[in-house]
Amino acid sequence: MSNTPIELKGSSFTLSVVHLHEAEPKVIHQALEDKIAQAPAFLKHAPVVLNVSALEDPVNWSAMHKAVSATGLRVIGVSGCKDAQLKAEIEKMGLPILTEGKEKAPRPAPAPQAPTQNTTPVTKTRLIDTPVRSGQRIYAPQCDLIVTSHVSAGAELIADGNIHVYGMMRGRALAGASGDRETQIFCTNLMAELVSIAGEYWLSDQIPAEFYGKAARLQLVENALTVQPLN
């Protein structure tokens, strides 16, 4: 046991950054409501950082903060702020001004090429080949998510497509986050805290005992969550 009451450690977290391109709070509120409706499992009540670097017109920060908070999103900081007056307003509300890492200079656009004939469509996939630790949230928008390592309890995987976990799955897995009921979850070792497909979910104690800790495949059948062995 440590002899000191606190201990400071470096850590990293996965957060969504909302880039504001409009200074009118009502417009931002409606745009966020629409975005949350598309992927409620990922965005509802999510912690976010607001990036204000693209704002050119003056903004009523108090009204903007209320508009964002009214959607259920939790503003934990602001980035991209260069205006001294806006900085003062933000800090007065108790929100930290966050400094982002330096961005790489954009590469010049490649010269246009003639379209290739008979091109085979490619399905996008997000691949994670490192362990997903407690507190991490990984989202794969409009694609499948593949994790080739273990997922700790307290971690969260979210994908608009399918989820594949080739390791011990102890966290939460939410496939079909944007409502696709044809998506599936594949695990080589199912010990999840929660599994969900298009909003239909099981908590850990609802997973049939014969599949717990086993290789399993989950999908919706007649709008009900089902599980079967993964062969």
UniProtKB/Swiss-Prot annotation:
GO biological process, one term: cell morphogenesis
InterPro entries to which the protein is assigned, alphabetical: CAP/MinC_C, MinC, MinC_C_sf, MinC_N, Septum_form_inhib_MinC_C
Signal peptide extent: none
Domain of life per record: Bacteria
Keywords: Cell cycle, Cell division, Septation
Keyword Hydrolase set for record: no
Region Disordered, residue ranges: 102-125
Compositional bias annotation for Low complexity: 114-123
The keyword Cell division belongs to this UniProt entry's keyword annotation: yes
One Pfam assignment: MinC_N
Family (UniProt): Belongs to the MinC family.
Subunit structure: Interacts with MinD and FtsZ.
NCBIfam families: minC
HAMAP family found in the cross-reference section: MinC (MF_00267)
Protein task: Cell division inhibitor that blocks the formation of polar Z ring septums. Rapidly oscillates between the poles of the cell to destabilize FtsZ filaments that have formed before they mature into polar Z rings. Prevents FtsZ polymerization.
Protein name: Probable septum site-determining protein MinC
Organism: Escherichia coli O45:K1 (strain S88 / ExPEC)
Lineage: Bacteria, Pseudomonadati, Pseudomonadota, Gammaproteobacteria, Enterobacterales
